Amino acid sequence: MSAALKLLEPLKYKAPCNPAYRAAQSVAHWHMGNITPHGGQTLPECNSSCHLARKVKNVGGTTLPRRTFTASSAHLGLEFNKASTLNASTLHPDSSSAGGGEEDVEVFDSFEGTRVFLKLRPEYQLHSYNRSDTHQPIAASEVELILHKVTFYQNKLQPEVITNYFYKLSSLPAEQNSVLLSSNSFALLCQLSVKNIQLFNTSDLISILKAFVDLRIPPSLSMLDVYETRFCHQVWEMTLDQLLLVADLWRNLGRRVPRFFKIFFSYLNLHWRELSLSQLIHLIYIIGENRQVPQDLMQRLESLILKYVDSVNLEEVGTICLGFFKSSSSLSEFVMRKIGDLACANMQHLSSHTLVHILKMFRFTHVDHIHFMKQFGEIAPQRIPSLGVQGVMHLTLACSALRILDERVMNAVAASLPPRVAHCRSKDVAKILWSFGTLNYKPPNTEEFYSSLINEIHRKMPEFNQYPEHLLTCLIGLAFSEYFPVEFINVALSPGFVKLAQERSKFELTKELFTLDGTVAIECPDYKGNRLNSHLQQETSANLWNLASKDMRSKPEFLETLYLLETMLGGPQYIKHHMILPHTRSSDLEVQLDANMKPMPFNSEATPTEDGAQLRFKQVGVSLTDDLMNQLLKGKAKRYFQGQIELETGQPPMELRKKTTVPLVNSGCNGTDRLGDGMVGLCPLAHMQPPLVKLAIQFTNKNQYCYGSRALLGLHNMKRRQLVQIGYRVVELPHWEWLPLLKRTRLEKLAYLHEKVFTSAL
């Protein structure tokens, strides 16, 4: 409450108002029609300080000669120069592209395209502003008269007159705005509005702000700071419709107003229950464009979404998703499933951009609405060719984030990209390569697809200086798919780029650099280019091990697995939990077997020492005989293991077991074991033979596979590929087998682990 009350205190601000200045040449020379000099002679050329530009016609058929003025209009930051007016016009793209065909597909008006929902309910007109609404164009003679009055009367102008002048001038045809903004008289009008700003009521302020939008006032002008401050004072005296309208006008103007929104959000914390459906949707849109919002407010708005969810249309559903996504605000799984259900009911009528917005939110919340994704897979291949590459990127990225491999979608993406790859940003190239690599999928046109994207990386190299994370994403995505463009790798691992990535990117990229470096070391033995320095390698490896170790040891199922393996093999010295390949960011359980396929006590970290000389190991392993295995593998368990073993080896389990049953005794160490009763033997570590087999036991979970399948994702598939390359045999304890077995008896678990370890060793 105290935080909210602080916002009620008046904000201190200064409205710098210089005395009204004389402007002998301040009035623009507004001329009517086709006026020519006496005698029909053409006008002589003006000098560089005041030249006639080409004439442009207004709607009424009159023309205004465009002039530039020598007098300064820098009061209050009113630098209405050519560059600023051009920039202002780009912030309000309201003209369609003259191009056609492929170009039209890539042209998306991100401003108007996200405001379609405002046209679908009449209620939105109460709290939004539509610049396309037509005004009766003002005559050039009236413009000239207004500007003359501004110059002549100056300080005698009343606030309501100033407001009226702005309103009338805002009806000027858009193509003549730059002429008006170049006028010293208009600069004087703006100065007078600032000087009298405390005399304007809320309606006046809103009217002037509308005029600023219509006239495309450059959003960077310092004059607008004064207006933001004044609106901050007015927040608690305004209605919800007025507040939303003001916020929408700032959005139309293209200016960020963080102070206004801070107070506006405080107001909403007290009045959020009063929001109507149209107000709620419009507010979520505005929040998304603002990018920042208190999360407690978003939680309140989520409850209102549930209240209105059955009344929203499809475009409003897309607006909800985009607003929450842009503001990095999550929605509950329940709400996301409701949204998915709404979309599924009308999937064919869903616009492509709304589809993209919904997928963004599914990606952000990691909600797997399978029915939605199935329907998406049916319509996406037809939509993708007519969707811009940025939209295609978001569709592809959503599939990879949700681990859903739909070959129809991926093939459509791969087929559509090569002809228009030049339209990709560096971000698009990176995310698409990452997505295909993550899903471990190679489309039918693999060669064309990858060669076009790799060539585009070359063309985008200057962009990577600004966005180094995108180059690393490209290269790691390519590595998942076994592509290693050494030219780019050499750049990415160069000292200069490493420094750039660590200093200039907003992301922590050390892990990405480490992953790329470790991958190159294994998979590119002939590579002679740049590598990370040893200090950075060791530091990153230690950090990753701390994270991986903490994560795995927080999982009870992993701890039980580790304990059972230690029991089966003979103690902690026979198994080691560590990161065999630190750059792959996950840990392993390593077991080493000698020439007789018996475990070796190689883990010195878990071995007690006596006087630093000999290492003594206690054999506490379990001898698994055929009789014991028969007792364990009865009923359902027996059928399960028998089916799995026959499937994987093609041999009946009893025949295989005769080959693989290994009594854990006499492996160079004397001693005999009983179940739970062992004797101690001496095994000097220095006399141990090199291991014949090194096993990397993988404790997996569902997030390492494509959804609903047993196909590994890119990083985990790459890790196994590299483990094999450095001489390990991978033993997988798949979650679909091992996790259900954890509920069974201890002996059944030991039997399963014995089969896995020693069958893999063959």
UniProtKB/Swiss-Prot annotation:
Q: Sites of the modification Phosphoserine?
A: S95
Q: Which UniProt keywords apply?
A: Acetylation, Mitochondrion, Mitochondrion nucleoid, mRNA processing, Phosphoprotein, RNA-binding, rRNA-binding, Transit peptide
Q: Which GO terms describe its molecular function?
A: rRNA binding
Task: Report domain RAP positions.
Answer: 695-755
What the entry lists under PROSITE patterns is as follows: RAP
Listed Pfam families: FAST_1, FAST_2, RAP
Q: What are the transmembrane regions?
A: none
Coiled coil (residue ranges)? none
Task: List this protein's GO terms for biological process.
Answer: mitochondrial RNA processing; mRNA processing; regulation of mitochondrial mRNA stability
A cellular component term (GO) from this record? mitochondrion
Which pairs of positions does the record mark as disulfide bonds? none
**Main localisation:** mitochondrion
Residues modified to N6-acetyllysine: K506
Tissue expression summary: Expression detected in spleen, testis, colon, heart, smooth muscle, kidney, brain, lung, liver, brown and white adipose tissue.
Q: Where in the cell is it found?
A: Mitochondrion matrix, Mitochondrion nucleoid
Xref: InterPro entries: FAST_2 (IPR013579), FAST_kinase (IPR050870), FAST_Leu-rich (IPR010622), RAP (IPR013584)
Record's subunit section = Found in a complex with GRSF1, DDX28, DHX30 and FASTKD2. Associates with the 12S mitochondrial rRNA (12S mt-rRNA).
What is the purpose of this protein?
A: Plays an important role in the processing of non-canonical mitochondrial mRNA precursors.
The family classification in the record reads: Belongs to the FAST kinase family.
Q: What name does UniProt use for this protein?
A: FAST kinase domain-containing protein 5, mitochondrial
